Structures are given as C-alpha cells and as structure tokens.
Amino acid sequence: MKNYNSHKYEYGLLKSTKPSMGYDGSIPLDEWKSQAKSKLTELLGLPFDECESKAEIEYSKECDGYTEHRFSVQTEPGYYVPCHLRIPSGVCKPIPLTLCLSGHGGGMHIALGVAKNEKDEASLSAWHHRAMAPRSNKEGRAALVIEARNFGEASLTGYGTSCTEAAKIAILMGRTVIGERVWDAMRITVRPIRIAIFAASVQLVP
C-alpha cells in the first residue's frame, strides 16, 4: 500500500537515522565534547554579531524581602531584551545568582510569580516551580529573569507566544529561534562560577 502521509515518512527517516555525533568511546570524551559543542553552535546559527549592551535601568524598587531592578540590554544591534533582577534582602554579599528562563506561557512575569490574568493564576497554581525568582530569593540567591524571544513582551501581542512565525523567518536567514534565545542569555565575558540556570516550559491546556 502506498504511503501518502509525509509525516509518517519523515518519522520513518528519523527512526532510521544514525546520529552523526553520537559518542561511541572511540575518541577521548573531552575531544568529543569539543566537537559536539562546535556542531551544536553551527546548527543553532551562532554566533551572532556582538554589540554594545547599552544597558538601561528603567526602575528600581524596594519590595517585601527583595529589591527589584527592571532594565533592558541590547543583545543584537537594534534588539533589546527586557529583564528583571531581584536581590534578596538581608543577605551577605556577594551572593550567587540564578538565571531564570521561562518557557511557553504568558511571559517572564510567570517566572517572577506574577499573574496578569486567570490563565496565569491557573498556571502558577498547577506548576508552582514556574515561579523561579521567588524561590531563588528564598534560597538566598539573586534572580535574573529575562524575556525569551517571541514570549511575553517580546511576542507579537505583548503576551503569550508567537514562535511559529519567528521560527520560519529565522530558518530562511540561516538562524534559529532557540539560537537567538541562547544568544540573549549568554555573555562570553562572564565566568559562570556561582551562576545557576533554571528553565521551565509547560503549556497549560484548558
């Protein structure tokens, strides 16, 4: 019987494909890690052109148990990422930091533990771990929350997600949306000592 289902065909190709970068022990692990990192960087479409950060603080405010700084930083020429830095009160400095990356949902406000509507309230109620910043502060860590591309304030409407459109455009330019998000979250000049990363992605189905 002829197969007219293209998805079934592609799935068959996927199952029969042998990963080209699979580790088989024939070379030292560190050498394989270097090769894998180089290939992953290539597939993500990285690196992009570096630029001035032009960081600008929009506001700073004292809250119950922490100080919050809202700021933006330029990650590509003409593109700025909105961020929130929460520093817990009453801790000895310097302190460790958690980079909080929220996934599919309303936006980075979820990682801050802030609900903008009933859908957000349901999400935070069902998935407590998505409120990453409050947990980090409770553990004595600073929390840096950034808005991922095509999510929240960076989406078409300023709330929710708009990944599909952006992903198609990125592919046409030899880029990837995931590569763009990685680029926004990394800084080559920063040493990752005492910096943790926490990411959560879930789509709440009503």
Where on the chain are the PLM-derived regions?
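Cap/lid segment of the alpha/beta-hydrolase catalytic domain
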Residues: 93, 101-193
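Short beta-strand segments that buttress and anchor functional surface loops
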Residues: 69-76
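N-terminal targeting or regulatory segments adjacent to alpha/beta-hydrolase or S9 domains
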Residues: 1-67
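Short, glycine/acidic-rich beta->alpha junctions
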Residues: 65, 78, 124-128, 184, ...
